[in-house]
Amino acid sequence: TKMTKAERTSMLQLLQSLPEWLSPLCKTNIVIFRGDSFQLKVTEPTKALQIALAIRAIIRANKFAGNNEQWDARLAIGIGTLDYETDSLSTSDGEAYRLSGRGLDLIGRARLHIETPWEEVNNELIVSTLFADDIVTRWTPSQSRIMFEKLVKNNSQEDIGNILGVSRQMVSKTLKVAKDALISVYIKRFKELINERTVWERQ
């Protein structure tokens, strides 16, 4: 990634703030390495997709160091067991970490990829993930700001408008253009698939 020193510093500050910003959804831990690369552990696997989309939204919403260029992130979600945990994510190991790594190898030109231990789940999600990725990649900064509030806090349109200083009508119009309804269906189906498998494996 070609970023100036000021942009990297600004991006680093944002990444370090992610656990706090994402806390309304669930607890997360982050490790940052190689400048703007990072790994995030999510304590509730059914919320992994929602968190990934929220991360892309907040990055796309920000102007780093005042630069007008819109940045994004390439994210690979790995769902699985954790075999070995330490205080640092960089030295922890397990199925989830390995699947996330494999996802990054397979992501190609896309910016979102999901790998699970279940082939039928992967097969179902691959097409919908490509469509969702295309939608998110088109979000403008203003759309991204509103989508972040919706994804993380699920606030009403009026509340989002009050937080961001825009009218409820503008929020409604923006959510429609950003295809919030389709994103919500995608997230709902992901949660159902992961919950079905994890509940079955716990029995």
What label would you give each PLM region?
Residues T1-Q203:
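Regulatory and interdomain segments flanking nucleotide-handling catalytic cores
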